[in-house]
């Protein structure tokens, strides 16, 4: 998934699952499974339920995404 292909949307983390996977509710009401990006893992950025995040979705599978940024 290259940067040009990814669809970026905003959402809110609803639930933390094992292996740095999260259930995220998007602004349009859909719920997806999202995993933490490698750069966020490397810098030990913590995500807790209730955080606002930016998610990159693949155009091929809109039910899974990658958390790219945590809003402050």
Swiss-Prot record:
Cited Pfam families: eIF-1a (PF01176)
Compartments where located: Cytoplasm
UniProt keyword Cytoplasm present: yes
Gene3D superfamilies: Nucleic acid-binding proteins
Main location: cytoplasm
Cellular component GO terms, alphabetical: cytosol
GO molecular function: ribosome binding; rRNA binding; translation initiation factor activity
InterPro entries linked: NA-bd_OB-fold, RNA-binding_domain_S1_IF1, S1_domain, TIF_IF1
Keyword Oxidoreductase: no
Domain S1-like: 1-72
Xref: SMART domains: S1
Role this protein plays: One of the essential components for the initiation of protein synthesis. Stabilizes the binding of IF-2 and IF-3 on the 30S subunit to which N-formylmethionyl-tRNA(fMet) subsequently binds. Helps modulate mRNA selection, yielding the 30S pre-initiation complex (PIC). Upon addition of the 50S ribosomal subunit IF-1, IF-2 and IF-3 are released leaving the mature 70S translation initiation complex.
Subunit structure: Component of the 30S ribosomal translation pre-initiation complex which assembles on the 30S ribosome in the order IF-2 and IF-3, IF-1 and N-formylmethionyl-tRNA(fMet); mRNA recruitment can occur at any time during PIC assembly.
Name of protein: Translation initiation factor IF-1
């Amino acid at each position: 998934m290259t940067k040009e292909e990814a669809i970026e949307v905003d959402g809110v983390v609803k639930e933390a699952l094992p292996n740095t996977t999260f259930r995220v509710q998007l602004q349009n009401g859909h719920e997806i499974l999202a995993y933490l990006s490698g750069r966020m893992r490397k810098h030990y950025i913590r995500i807790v339920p209730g955080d606002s995040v930016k998610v990159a979705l693949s155009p091929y599978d809109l039910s899974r995404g990658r958390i790219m940024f945590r809003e402050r």
